[in-house]
Every structure is written in structure tokens, then in C-alpha cells.
């Protein structure tokens, strides 16, 4: 479906089937606050916070079955702090630590 660029206010984009695809706010033509993406079946895909048009805050992704896929923080469009990754059964796979977008530590969890 056609989308229009907003300078201020709520932005909503839709799939052809009418399901909401993306929703979030613009302020002075920049993304701000919480933005959410869904897949075509209406399942939440990801959620991120923006500040002045840049990713800034917690970002969470989900597997198609609704289990968390990964979660971490951004600061000014860069991965920062602890990021956790899960498999589609909800078991933690790994964690990573970033500082201003650079990987500092990565750890894989043992599988039994």
C-alpha cells in the first residue's frame, strides 16, 4: 500500500491484506519514541525506541512463534551494552556486550 511521509504525528503503514505493518511517531520529520513492526499475520516482529531519528533505547525482535529472538540497547544508532539472543524455543543461545557499536565480549551458552 502507498505510504506518505509525515513531518509530525502518528505514522501507520499497512500490508496489502490490511494488517498493520509499522506504527510509530515522527517529530520534525524524524522518528521518535516507540516504533513497532508486525508480520503479515499480525504477530509482533520488532519494537525499537528512537530519539531524534536515531535508534536509541531497547530493541526487541521476536521469532514467528512469538518467542523472543534478540534484545539489546542502542545509543545513537549503535549497539551498546548487553544483547541477548534466544532460539525459537525460548532458550538463550548467546549474549554479547557492545560499546558504541563495537563488540567487546561474546559468549555462547552450552547446549545439552
Predicted regions mapped to residue ranges:
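Glycine/tyrosine- and acidic-biased, solvent-exposed loop/turn segments at the edges of beta-strands
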Residues: 1-112
Amino acid at each position: 500500500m502507498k505510504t506518505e511521509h509525515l513531518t509530525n504525528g502518528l505514522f501507520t503503514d499497512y500490508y496489502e491484506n490490511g494488517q498493520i505493518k509499522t506504527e510509530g511517531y515522527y517529530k520534525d520529520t524524524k522518528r521518535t519514541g516507540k516504533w513497532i513492526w508486525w508480520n503479515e499475520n499480525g504477530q509482533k516482529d520488532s519494537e525499537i525506541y528512537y530519539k531524534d531519528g536515531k535508534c536509541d533505547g531497547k530493541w526487541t525482535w521476536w521469532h514467528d512463534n512469538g518467542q523472543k529472538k534478540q534484545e539489546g540497547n542502542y545509543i545513537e544508532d549503535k549497539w551498546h551494552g548487553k544483547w541477548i539472543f534466544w532460539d525459537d524455543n525460548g532458550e538463550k543461545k548467546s549474549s554479547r556486550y557492545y560499546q558504541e557499536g563495537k563488540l567487546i565480549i561474546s559468549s555462547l551458552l552450552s547446549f545439552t
